[in-house]
Curated annotation (Swiss-Prot):
Gene Ontology MF, one: phosphoribosylamine-glycine ligase activity
EC number(s) reported in the record: 6.3.3.1
The entry's keywords: ATP-binding, Cytoplasm, Ligase, Nucleotide-binding, Purine biosynthesis
Gene3D superfamilies linked: PurM-like C-terminal domain, PurM-like, N-terminal domain
Stated family: Belongs to the AIR synthase family.
Name recorded for this polypeptide: Phosphoribosylformylglycinamidine cyclo-ligase
CDD domains: PurM
Chief location: cytoplasm
Alphabetical list of NCBIfam families matching this protein: purM
InterPro entries xrefs: PurM-like_C_dom, PurM-like_C_sf, PurM-like_N, PurM-like_N_sf, PurM_cligase
Pathway: Purine metabolism; IMP biosynthesis via de novo pathway; 5-amino-1-(5-phospho-D-ribosyl)imidazole from N(2)-formyl-N(1)-(5-phospho-D-ribosyl)glycinamide: step 2/2
Length: 346
């Protein structure tokens, strides 16, 4: 039967080898609350140790999108898993939740044990950065659905927060200060446009350094998404945070309003933070308007937090002590949506 299955394109032995290879990476993510080991039908996590008055579970799921195609082109697979974790855990930490565990889903045309190991190595690194356990996953070999070199990657996370400490944004008022945490680069959104502008139309090479980039283009584009969990959880222990936004697809213009109550807008001060050279290269090569850039990309800011003005400097200092680059980038105002430099729309 194994030979028949192999002739159909599914290599069971390769699947077993991939699982064996990934175990050492997964083990590095374990928390004391994890029950059992790899290989069970489901992952188990003991919640009894959390002394919360009204515990609330917060879940999130996401993928890496077409950034995967850059990984295929560069044949580099050991960091794309960090992106998968980041996209999920950053989404739930903005609600005040501590990520507890993570599960991954890898679908591929052909199970290559070394490639699968590298993907899971990255996922495990992301979980360590976020402090969550990788308690399960699925690797599906699907010949005919994907080419032998292709795979898709998605993740799922669950976190916990005391109900009274959920960050909703509903108490944000005009005059609150917006603090931005620097991104590592493009993160994991907008890569369909990135490929069209830089690789298809611009015919740039992944191996060359362009303009003010410090790395070859391929390395720049594959920089992993920053994981903000630990600095944000430390911030929440020490200060009141009124709202947070993870700047993903839709950029500033779509994501900042997601944390704001009705009747409140955001005014952003352009020039108050450093926009990385990769965004300038994209805008120049693609002849993209500034509004389009801010409506697609994070433009150098991966997370925005809303705080009281009197707390802002202390919070910037705390975030900097946690290793983040943090800047005051604007404030909340009466109105709606996002404007720039004195209330102007881009």
């Amino acid at each position: 039967m194994a030979n028949a299955y192999k002739q159909a394109g599914v290599d069971i032995e390769a699947g077993y080898e991939a699982v064996s290879r990934m175990k050492k990476h997964v083990q590095t993510t374990m928390r004391k609350e994890v029950l059992g080991g790899l290989g069970g039908f489901g992952g188990m996590f003991d919640l009894s140790k959390f002394a919360l008055e009204e515990p609330v579970l917060v879940s999130g799921t996401d993928g890496v999108g077409t950034k995967l195609m850059l990984a295929f082109m560069a044949d580099k697979h050991d960091t794309i898993g960090i992106d998968a974790v980041a996209m999920c855990v950053n989404d739930i930490v903005v609600q005040g939740a501590e990520p507890l565990f993570f599960l991954d889903y890898i679908a591929c045309g052909k199970a290559e044990p070394s490639k699968i190991e590298n993907i899971v190595k990255g996922i495990s690194e992301g979980c360590r950065q976020a402090g969550c356990a990788l308690i399960g996953g699925e690797t599906a070999e699907m010949p005919g659905m994907y080419s032998t070199e292709e795979y898709d990657l998605a993740g799922f996370t669950v976190g916990i927060v005391d109900k009274k400490k959920i960050v909703t944004g509903e108490k944000i008022e005009a005059g609150h200060v917006l603090i931005g945490l620097a991104s590592s680069g493009i993160h994991s959104n907008g890569y369909s446009l990135v490929r069209k502008v830089l690789l298809e139309d611009g015919e740039l090479s992944l191996d060359r350094i362009y303009g003010r980039l410090e790395l070859p283009l391929g390395e720049e584009l594959l920089k992993p998404t920053k994981i903000y969990v630990k600095p944000i959880l430390e911030l929440l222990k020490n200060h009141e945070v009124y709202g947070m936004a993870h700047i993903t697809g839709g950029g500033f213009i779509e994501n900042i309003p997601r944390m704001l109550p009705e009747g409140i807008g955001a005014e952003i001060e352009l020039g108050s933070w450093k926009i990385q050279p990769i965004f300038s290269l994209l805008q120049e090569v693609g002849k993209l308007e500034e509004k389009e850039m801010f409506n697609i990309f994070n433009m150098g800011i991966g997370m925005v937090v809303a705080v009281k003005e009197e707390d802002a400097k202390d919070i910037v200092r705390l975030l900097e002590e946690q290793g983040e680059t943090a800047r005051i980038i604007g404030r909340t105002v009466k109105g709606a949506g996002v404007t720039f430099n004195g209330g102007k729309a881009l």
